[in-house]
Regions:
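Conserved, helical-rich catalytic subdomain that frames metal- and/or nucleotide-binding sites
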Residues: 51-53, 142-144, 148-239, 252-267, ...
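Conserved glycine-rich beta-strand-loop-beta hairpin in the small C-terminal domain of fold type I
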Residues: 246-249
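Short glycine-rich phosphate-binding loop at a beta-alpha junction
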Residues: 90, 239-243
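DPxDG-like acidic metal-binding loop motif
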Residues: 99-129, 141-143
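Hydrophobic C-terminal alpha-helix "anchor/cap" residues
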Residues: 32-35, 76, 132, 231, ...
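ATP-binding N-lobe of GHMP and related small-molecule kinases
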Residues: 1-99, 116-126, 151-153, 161, ...
């Protein structure tokens, strides 16, 4: 059987505002981009009554049997959208879990994109968005991996990537609980992205923004604050900000050289922490 390899890239929240609360979830708006760090998904058709899913790699431990990939396949089977085809799927996890980089959600989105590209899955846009929402709120963001503006009304605008920034991403040995972080939100921000524009991805514009979840995470996890405080001192960083609900802290740079120098400084200070 032919085997396919799919790259599933990590996402970063360049900025995130919590605007209010809906019935079940908080209403947020965010600026999102994708980076070169990726998981690898290997897929092949098999003759079996069931799909087979395996996780390997450094960050494959403690992944539940009920995960974004199993949920996706169960939903597709329930709707008979795979025509009874079964697959063996192996995911090499290079993206840390609980890091705020949407590893699991992007795995599901990348697999959906692949199935559509190979005409294995034929689905209309409305049904596709509904499918993504059933798996996880971030999945829809990965269906087109370009600079993305998520408005508080749920609308998504994709933008052309015109400016390359280089990132130093540091994650401590622990992850942050998304549910816990959001449960501590007590105040809301005014909407800033109602009128999405390309200029929102310009470094000087991004520098003035925030991640509303960051202060909550820093209070809950003091060791995270120590990491961020050091990263702010790294020479020539444009800005430093947590992605998603953490626990990854990201420093942004104009040049690869400055980013590489910062990496060396960080590893000398925090050698035990994961960093790229």
């Amino acid at each position: 059987m032919t085997s396919f390899k799919i790259k599933s890239h990590a996402k970063l929240n360049l900025a995130l505002n919590v605007i209010g609360r809906a019935v079940k979830l908080h209403k947020i708006e965010s600026l999102i981009s994708f980076i070169s760090l990726h998981d690898l998904i290997y897929l092949k058709k098999i003759k079996s009554n069931n799909h087979k899913i395996f996780f390997t790699g450094k960050f494959s431990k403690n992944i539940s049997k009920i995960n974004t990939i199993s949920t996706l396949l169960n939903l597709l089977d329930a709707e008979k959208l795979l025509n009874n085809q079964k697959f063996e799927i192996k995911i090499r996890k290079n993206i840390p879990h609980g890091a705020g980089m949407g590893g699991g959600s992007m795995n599901a989105a990348s697999l959906i994109n692949f199935l559509i590209s190979k005409k294995i899955l034929k689905i209309k846009n409305k049904k596709l968005n509904d499918l993504a929402a059933k798996i996880g709120s971030d999945v829809v963001l990965g269906l087109k991996q370009s600079n993305t503006i998520l408005s508080s009304n749920g609308k998504i605008k994709r933008c052309v990537n015109k400016k390359t920034l280089y990132v130093l991403i540091a994650k401590p040995y622990f992850g942050c609980s998304t549910k816990l972080i959001y449960s501590k939100v007590v105040s809301f921000s005014k909407s800033q992205f109602k009128r999405p524009q390309q200029k929102m991805f310009q470094p000087q514009y991004l520098k003035a923004l925030n991640n509303d979840l960051e202060k909550i995470a820093l209070r809950k996890y003091p060791k995270l604050n120590k990491i961020r405080s050091f990263m702010v001192t790294l020479p020539k960083n444009i800005f430093v900000r947590m992605t998603g609900s953490g626990s990854s802290i990201v420093a942004y740079f104009h040049s690869q050289k400055d980013c590489s120098n910062a990496y060396g400084q960080f590893k000398r200070k925090f050698n035990s922490h994961w960093c790229i």
